[in-house]
From Swiss-Prot:
Zn(2+) binds at residues 876, 879, 892, 895. It comes from Onion yellows phytoplasma (strain OY-M). It is found in: Cytoplasm. A motif ('HIGH' region) lies at residues 59-69. Its EC number is 6.1.1.5. This is Isoleucine--tRNA ligase. It comes from the Bacteria. IleRS has two distinct active sites: one for aminoacylation and one for editing. The misactivated valine is translocated from the active site to the editing site, which sterically excludes the correctly activated isoleucine. The single editing site contains two valyl binding pockets, one specific for each substrate (Val-AMP or Val-tRNA(Ile)). Binds 1 zinc ion per subunit. Catalyzes the attachment of isoleucine to tRNA(Ile). As IleRS can inadvertently accommodate and process structurally similar amino acids such as valine, to avoid such errors it has two additional distinct tRNA(Ile)-dependent editing activities. One activity is designated as 'pretransfer' editing and involves the hydrolysis of activated Val-AMP. The other activity is designated 'posttransfer' editing and involves deacylation of mischarged Val-tRNA(Ile). ATP binds at residue 594.
Length: 900
């Protein structure tokens, strides 16, 4: 009867499960965190240390979270967890953007627009926003995001609104807020103004018309037409001037008995447009642009005369060299019109309907285009009509085209602070680096910021008007309103009459009858979120955050508005570092949509596969660019996760019965091969910690995962089996290996906690001699200052040598010479340099274990070589090394001694 020697082996033993079952287990781990109050406990641990503030940009409180939200919040969680484990005090205040059109539109969608008076609409909007905040809060928590979830900041909170109004007041006091009639981006669909940040540019079909305006007869200008080109025929009834460039050359040409005035450099382009033969073009006269100033022409559409003016914004190339000017429908037109005191005529109203300035009154502007083109043709003023596809601004919410319309609006003066904005932009660290150029260009080209909106759900613009309709720009008055809002909420702006809103006994010389009115427009929601740094003041934290991290679309949005309000009031940027991530697409780089059936829902993935799988996917992407996800990509991430988990399990299993207080052997007392393993790992740790420090999470895995799979699992733990399983429990080298495994595992758990916190928390629960109640309460590994270079150099030479030996063994296995490496006896020919490496590491007697063979014979030669032979003798029935010379002997001498 054969003896079962397996029972004499010290096999790995652990209750840590092989299968993660993350969908269910993560919820239990999160309950463990909640019971510990883990977020607050970590803050208390670091409360006396330097702060590190990541300011959470507020997502919009509308709908469930999507994979873009998951990417954003998980990246932030990586940073906060890492910095807190470094020892920084890292409060994370989650926030939500709770005002604005999408919420108002969603509420109105459920009933007719006229069914609500203002107060019930405000109540319904608030109810809708809070419901979505609560929903998203639980969804973010399911992803393992830590933060002060009990005390988030909401842009609808009384304290937030009052602080926002105070910031507005400071900007008023500095002369940065003004009301003016200006052309703005206007949505006729929403009947509201839009900021630059609310525009998207899409390809759009527009009419393309070339129109001839008859010049008033004067000497040479008899029967001459000024030729203009426009893609907005509906603006022609609002035309009051035609602009030419003062320094450019113009020619009066005759083509087939018709006379036109056009730019000289535009003639080749016009030849193609009108199919003119060059020989049919006769140049009658040549002029410098400035000589044409004040000449007049007739606009037959409205039977009015306009004049030629000079402007620098007239360009060569495409077009005619003359620009149709309608100050009511374009900022450049408006600005040049101011110089000439031109009338601001608007041919359409807020609904996009034509006004009474023309016979087209009542037509929607797109319908008016057709009628205008028809009338121009009848009048013989139309030279050519076509349709072009070009980039055109659309409202980013409705996806409908916007128009330019002159209306009285409230603005922030960018011009006054532009130089300081640019100066502060240069002080910020931008990741990626091109972010600085992008923001610089945006600020350089930015016009005054239109902050008024003609909607209901938002923060009122806290301005009163005198009897003469003059706005009262008074800091004390605005701060008084802010105090009222903080006490009673912003709805009082609509519920209370003006006198109740004003300070008691308030008087103003411009209102002798003590009559006042109030502004009914609300603030742009970007002004709301753009003042969110104010939440730190009431929590006794610095206003300038260490990091803002959002999607790359926020250069025009939150990064921009926050910079403007902070520079305007604090004279500094609100952030030291700005990090951006790309958008999430499917595996083929396509946008996710329900219609395409390619949507990957983070909550579904968390339920089915686990939040740590999503987090590991995030860490494995170059998030600065657009990223991709699909089931195949997630499968690869699961495979990666499984290898990490299995390694953790094997390491835990081999720490069974390990008593750190009595079994642990310090680094200095371990033999060189185990020291070298730790030194090699510490080099990896340096790179891992540097990657974290530079927000390169892909780099964390790039350094860590190959080490786990190739160095720890495939090398160290593999060769260690012959010692861990076979030797006695108190064998010195076995304790060295266990001590090394202990150090490796603890450090791995520490550095992987920001990325897969549920898993590391679970492993830590099985970890012997855990000193904290959760791995998150540990610190990041502290790198030791050791003189490592010589030992590590020889160790790397050995690893290269071992890699070559394994290739020879694999060839022998494939040829059928051996079935497993333990059947091999290798003769190793080494150079002096290679032999020296073995001497330094003191591993010559251990090579059979390191190569997992039964016997190694060494020879000093000029060149490296390996000869593989089948080991002679019999295999030990316990350790399976082929070292027994006598038949029918079950155990080798080593195993016999162990079992004595």
């Amino acid at each position: 009867m054969t003896t079962n020697y397996k029972t004499t082996l010290l096999m790995p033993k652990t209750d840590f499960p092989m299968k993660g079952n993350l969908g269910k287990n993560e919820i239990n781990i999160q309950k463990h965190w909640q019971k510990l109050d883990l977020y607050q406990k970590k803050l208390q641990q670091n409360q006396d240390n330097n702060p590190f503030i990541l300011h959470d940009g507020p997502p919009y409180a509308n709908g469930n979270i999507h994979m873009g939200h998951a990417l954003n919040k998980i990246l932030k969680d990586f940073i906060v967890r890492f910095r807190s484990m470094q020892g920084f005090y890292t409060p994370l205040i989650p926030g939500w953007d709770t005002h604005g059109l999408p919420i108002e539109a969603a509420v109105l969608k459920k009933t007719s627009k006229n069914a609500f008076t203002r107060k019930p609409l405000l109540d319904k909007c608030q109810e809708f926003a809070l419901e979505n905040v609560n929903n998203q809060k639980h969804q973010f928590q399911r992803l393992g995001i830590l933060g002060d979830w009990q005390n988030p900041y909401l842009t609808l909170d009384k304290t937030f609104v009052s602080d926002q109004v105070r910031i507005f007041g400071q900007m008023v006091d500095k002369g940065l807020i003004f009301k003016a009639l200006k052309p703005i981006h206007w949505s006729p669909t929403l009947e509201s103004a839009l900021a630059e940040a609310e525009l998207e540019y899409h390809n759009h079909q527009s009419p393309s018309v070339y129109v001839a305006f008859s010049m008033k007869k004067l000497d040479i200008f008899d029967n001459v037409a000024l030729v203009i080109w426009t893609t907005t025929p509906w603006t022609l009834p609002a035309n009051v001037a035609i602009a030419v460039h003062p320094e450019k050359e113009y020619q009066l040409i005759e083509v087939l008995q018709k006379r036109y005035l056009v730019g000289t450099k535009n003639i080749p382009f016009l030849q193609k447009v009108f199919a003119w033969n060059k020989e049919n073009i006769k140049v009658v006269a040549t002029f410098e642009g400035k000589t044409l100033e004040h000449l007049t022409y007739q606009n037959h559409l409205v039977s009015k005369f306009g004049k030629i003016i000079l402007s620098q914004h007239v360009l060569d190339g495409e077009g005619t060299g003359l620009v149709h000017i309608a100050p009511g429908h374009g900022l450049d037109d408006f600005l040049v019109g101011q110089k000439y005191n031109l009338d601001v005529v608007c041919s359409i109203d807020k609904k996009g309907m034509m006004t009474d300035v023309s016979k087209y009154q009542g037509l929607f502007y797109t319908k008016a285009n057709e009628a205008i083109i028809s009338d121009l043709e009848k009048d013989h003023s139309l030279l050519k009509a076509d349709v072009i596809l070009h980039s055109y601004p659309h409202d980013w919410r409705t996806k409908k085209p916007v128009i330019s319309l002159a209306l009285p609006q409230w603005f922030v003066s960018i011009k006054k602070i532009k130089s300081l904005l640019l100066e502060e932009t240069q002080k910020v660290k931008w990741i990626p680096r091109w972010g600085e150029l992008k923001m610089t260009n945006m600020i350089t080209n930015r016009e005054d910021w239109n902050i008024s909106r003609q909607r209901t759900w938002g923060v009122p613009i806290p301005i009163f008007y005198t009897e003469t309709h003059q706005p009262i720009l008074d800091l004390k008055l605005i701060n008084h309103v802010a105090d009222l809002f903080e006490q009673h909420g912003m709805d009082i702006w609509y519920e209370w009459d003006v006198k109740k809103l004003l300070p008691e006994n308030y008087i103003n010389p411009q209102s002798p009858n003590n009559l006042f009115t109030k502004e009914l427009d609300i603030m742009d929601v970007w002004f709301d979120s753009g003042t969110s740094y104010s939440v730190f003041k009431k929590r006794n934290q610095v206003l300038q955050s260490d990091v803002y991290l959002e999607g790359s679309d926020q250069y025009r949005g939150w990064f921009n508005s926050s910079l403007i309000t902070s520079v305007a009031t604090q004279n500094q940027a609100p952030y030291k570092t700005v990090i951006t991530h790309g958008f999430v697409f499917d595996g083929e780089g396509k946008k996710m949509s329900k219609s395409l059936g390619n949507v990957i829902d983070p909550l579904t993935v968390a339920e089915q596969k686990g939040a740590d799988i999503i987090r590991l996917w995030v860490a494995n992407t170059n998030y600065n660019l657009d990223v991709r996800i699909n089931p195949s990509i997630l499968k690869q991430v699961e495979d990666l996760y499984r290898k990490i988990r299995n390694t953790f399990r094997f390491m835990l299993g081999n720490l069974d019965n390990f008593k750190k207080d009595t079994n642990y052997i310090a680094f200095e007392q371990r033999t060189f091969i185990h020291q070298a393993m730790m030194l090699d790992f510490e080099e990896v740790l340096k790179n891992v910690l540097h990657s974290y420090d530079t927000y390169n999470f892909e780099g964390v895995l790039r350094h860590l995962f190959p080490f786990i799979t190739n160095k720890i699992s495939a090398f160290y733990l593999d060769f260690a089996k012959d010692i861990l399983y076979i030797e006695k429990e108190d064998h010195k080298e076995r304790k060295m290996i266990q001590s090394t495994i202990y150090d490796l595992l603890l450090s791995l758990l520490q550095v992987l906690t920001p990325i897969i916190p549920h898993t590391t928390s679970e492993v830590y629960g099985f970890f012997p001699f855990a000193v904290e109640k959760d791995i998150y309460l540990e610190k990041m590994p502290q790198l030791k200052a050791r003189p490592t270079s010589h030992l590590l150099l020889e160790y790397h030479k050995f690893l290269t040598l071992r890699k070559n030996v394994l290739q020879y063994l694999e060839k022998a296995r494939q040829s059928g010479l051996i079935n497993s490496s333990l059947q091999a006896h290798i003769t190793l020919s080494l150079t002096q340099e290679e032999m020296h490496a073995l001497d330094v590491l003191q591993i010559k007697d251990q090579l059979h274990q390191l190569f997992i063979v039964s016997k190694v014979t060494l020879q000093l030669k000029d060149t490296f070589d390996v000869k593989v032979a089948k080991a002679s003798g019999y295999a030990c029935q316990r350790c399976w090394n082929v070292v027994i010379t006598k038949p029918l002997t079950p155990l080798c001498t080593r195993c016999q001694n162990i079992l004595k």
